[in-house]
């Protein structure tokens, strides 16, 4: 029954939507991000709360057998923007620091996403890392890549996470370390 299937999907999307104000803030639509194609293409408007919400459109996958079906449930291992972000991170905090090169790498991805406003030339290391984090959050919605970014950099509190969600606790290895699969434990393959 198509109506039942839609309502099942609808119920799932309601749990994964964000308020318009949060999406607008993330993509800086009152400033440089007004033309960001990620904002326009990765979200669709939903109205689950009175103030309006957006749901990531990458979560919706058609269940037909059409030409797009072969891409259902697939996720790339790495994408070109992620390689640029990794290179920028190395230029910001690695042994071969070059803040100008890091800024250029970030700017190249931003331009490819229709964000043409140049990053401030006076951004220091902390400012560039903050900008890099923002770009990760925009680019990798619902992919889990941001989790590994936070883990790699040792974030102790996840940005935009309320104390209600975290219980005011510090995020540590207990959160970042994923549990071993049951099969690994049962077969004694853990080393």
Model feature map: region roles:
Residues 1-18, 22, 28-191:
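Acidic/polar-rich alpha-helix caps and helix-coil junctions
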